[in-house]
Regions:
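ER/Golgi luminal nucleotide-sugar-dependent glycosyltransferases, focusing on the catalytic module
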Residues: 1-297
Length: 297
């Protein structure tokens, strides 16, 4: 059986108890949010888990009403929690806030997502086929790019980042590694508590400060004048620094080597392994699929 392939039996998840769905929400309706969450809760790997839905809302809704509306629209008996946040930092700040304030209470796995999933069918497919108890990090984006080093990194869009900024983050996240890394997109991924706790909490706290502190480097005029995002301006509710952190979740949570295999000329499996590296090539069946998986003990 492939290392990363799913099992048809929920017994595979014995000993894995909790899963939180952490949602960054602006003003999306409860019905819309539930239309993405409901199908996710229905997939096999989540059956039998104690699951919570945690909404970080920056909208004007009264939290209790939003919570009640979500409970009405989500067709499962799950705990729904709505936490109000200031409209600062978008999803990156919401995720970092969740990690830092709930450090001791993180679920076994957390699905981080925005209120509107990109390619939700692909998210469900990836979770169904590749989410297993020892998953440490699973990118749920339909897009992926690879950077050979932090001082030569750019992607298909107009994004890049200064080597000083990338070098600083990379050296703190992966101080013993000098290898390439895969960029993540869309602000949707799964991370285990084990992998999050493998990092220094202060790193996440310092990154959060870049978003919420108006005097931070990320909100300085010098940073905002970089040429790689033409036509975009920085603000507390739309920080340019968010484009960078969106791409670096794998770096922040997975400080281990990257292994790449190419299958059938067009299929890539990006596997991140804590210990031995075992190609799970038989699990990669679909053309043009980009997967990032970290396997823990």
């Amino acid at each position: 059986m492939p290392l990363i392939a799913r099992s048809s039996s929920s017994n595979m998840f014995q000993g894995l108890d909790t899963m939180d769905l952490v949602v960054s929400r602006y003003d999306e309706s409860a019905n819309s949010i539930a239309s993405y969450i409901g199908p996710i809760l229905n997939i096999t790997p989540l059956s039998g888990l104690t699951t919570r839905v945690i909404i970080y809302s920056t909208g004007q809704d009264e939290p209790k009403k939003l919570r009640d509306d979500l409970r009405h629209h989500i067709p499962f008996n799950v705990d729904v929690i709505v936490r109000q946040r200031p409209n600062v930092g978008r999803e990156c700040a919401a995720f970092l806030h969740h990690i830092t304030t709930g450090w001791q209470d993180l679920a076994d796995h957390t699905l981080f997502m925005q209120a509107e999933l990109h390619h939700s069918w692909s998210v469900r497919w990836r979770m169904q086929d590749y989410f297993v108890p020892n998953t440490g990090f699973l990118s749920l984006s339909d897009v992926s790019e690879y950077c050979s080093s932090w001082d030569q990194c750019w992607d298909h869009s107009t994004w890049s980042e200064s080597s000083d900024v990338l070098g600083s983050i990379y050296s703190r996240a992966s101080p013993t590694l000098r290898q390439g890394f895969t960029l993540t997109y869309r602000g949707q991924f799964i991370a285990s508590r084990h992998r999050i706790h493998s990092q220094d909490k202060q790193l996440f706290q310092d990154l959060l400060d870049e978003f919420v502190n108006p005097r931070s480097m990320a909100h300085s005029s010098g940073y905002a004048e970089h040429p790689w995002l033409p036509g975009k301006s920085d603000s507390m509710d739309r920080p340019l620094f968010g484009y960078t952190i969106e791409r670096l979740w794998g770096v922040l949570i997975c400080d281990v080597p990257m292994y790449n295999w190419r299958i059938d000329a067009q299929v890539f499996c990006h596997l991140r392994l804590d210990q031995s590296c075992i190609p799970a090539l038989r699990s990669c069946k679909t053309v043009n699929v980009l997967i990032s998986v970290l396997v823990t003990h």
